[in-house]
A protein has these predicted regions:
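Active-site-adjacent substrate-binding region
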Residues: 299-326
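Alpha-helical scaffolding within the catalytic cores
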Residues: 240, 265-273, 325-331
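Active-site-adjacent mobile loop/cap segments within catalytic or ligand-binding domains
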Residues: 320-375
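A short, glycine/acidic-enriched catalytic loop
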Residues: 185-189, 261-299
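Envelope-exposed proteins and targeting segments
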Residues: 161-164, 213, 250-252, 279-283, ...
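N-terminal Sec-pathway targeting helices
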Residues: 1-21
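N-terminal catalytic or cofactor-binding beta/alpha core of small enzyme domains
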Residues: 17-250, 260-265, 360, 368-374
Length: 375
């Protein structure tokens, strides 16, 4: 019954008592449904697609001079997770999300440019197996080449009841694009506090993969860069120190980020490669070096050996997967262990699925670097 038909009350005298009751019941039901429809109203297609994509994410278990400054997080609230036993992973498909199609592309969308960044050559680069190290320090290439031939300064125990690895995120709110096409929404600050869409989702895949391989791994999901980006490294340092005090068995601390490479025209770069027929984000390890002054890293040589071992492993397993290790005068709290590194998983131009897959591949490479090729 349409709402306007309710005014046709001149029929009522001709209805019996039972028929009158039925008519009034039907009329009331129609009015309720009509009002509900008016209140709900139509949902724009792009908004619907984004909502579906985020629901799919929630249900899925889930720098270099070129980098640009990024905006503040888009969401409100802060969260942290205590370490939990991670579920074994049977494949990347269980983590992947539904991406937005071109029907959701807004007017004025920015462009994304895909690029595979090759290994470097020349005097600034030191060969590292199939990979390479970009030397932005005063250390000689010969010194670096000799150093990375030495064994790892630590050993990890497989199937240990004690944690061996900690994964955390200084810039946890960094995120990725949610579009399948090469575009991003105008005004997208590439940050979110949604831990199914930001760096925590990538760290989760890495931790699951490492735990499934017998490497006891903790994953901290503290949003160290929220609500303030300033002071995020001080925040994450305190987090790591608490874990090391509670779990002195931890040998490796990985600070997992993503890069942000952008052209002068505003196009976002997506470092990509193809592994086993699936597109993945490229990754880049950053290892700091002591400069004798403002950057104090007495254990930089040990960290560099670790970086080289991981780089060799990843690039050997997945050719084209890594960008050269960046060896530079950067601190990044890498004084806390002899196995402390920062790794960039793709950039803000990559879509989330490429980053999730890259996280799994990077973890596979770490397993081989720490346990050997026969694991």
């Amino acid at each position: 019954m349409r709402y306007g038909e309710a005014g046709q009350s001149h029929l009522l005298p001709f209805l019996g008592a039972a028929a009158l009751f039925a008519a009034l019941t039907i009329m009331a039901h129609s009015v309720v449904l009509g009002l509900a429809a008016v209140i709900a109203g139509p949902v724009p297609a792009a908004q619907t697609a984004l909502s579906l994509s985020r629901k799919a994410v929630s249900g899925a278990a889930q720098e270099e001079a070129a980098s640009v400054a990024e905006a503040a997080p888009e969401s409100t609230g802060t969260a942290a997770s205590q370490p939990e036993a991670a579920a074994p992973t049977g494949g990347i498909e269980s983590y992947l999300v539904e991406l937005l199609g071109d029907d959701a592309r807004p007017e004025g969308a920015g462009a994304v440019i895909e690029k595979n960044y090759p290994q470097g050559s020349g005097e600034k680069y030191v060969a590292c197996g199939a990979g390479s190290i970009k030397n932005n320090t005063r250390q000689t290439a010969a010194d670096i080449a000799a150093e990375i031939q030495d064994p790892l300064p630590f050993g990890v125990e497989k199937d240990s009841p004690d944690p061996q690895i900690l994964i955390m995120h200084t810039h946890a709110t960094e995120d990725y694009r949610l579009s399948a096409g090469l575009w991003y929404s105008p005004g997208d600050g590439a940050r979110t506090t949604d831990m199914n869409l930001n760096m925590c989702a990538v760290g989760r895949v890495m931790a699951d993969t490492l735990n499934a391989a017998g490497l006891n791994t903790l994953h901290d999901e503290t949003l160290n860069d929220y609500p303030s980006y300033t002071g995020s490294y001080e925040n994450s340092r305190a987090v790591v120190q608490r874990y090391l005090a509670q779990y002195p068995s931890i040998k490796v601390v990985l600070d997992v980020h993503r890069d942000a490479i952008e052209t002068e025209g505003g196009s976002r770069m997506a470092p990509v490669c193809t592994v086993d027929g699936r597109q993945a984000a490229q990754v880049m390890i950053i290892c700091g070096c002591d400069n004798g002054g403002s950057v104090r890293l007495p254990g930089w040589r040990q960290n560099l050996r670790f970086a080289a071992a991981w780089e060799r492993s990843m690039e050997g397993m997945y050719p084209g997967f890594t960008r050269p290790v960046l060896f530079s005068y950067r601190f990044y709290n890498q004084d806390l262990t002899t196995g402390s590194l920062l790794i960039e998983i793709g950039g803000h131009g990559n879509n989330l699925n490429e980053a999730l897959y890259a996280g799994q591949l990077a973890a596979n490479g770490l397993v081989q670097a720490l346990l050997g090729p026969d694991t």
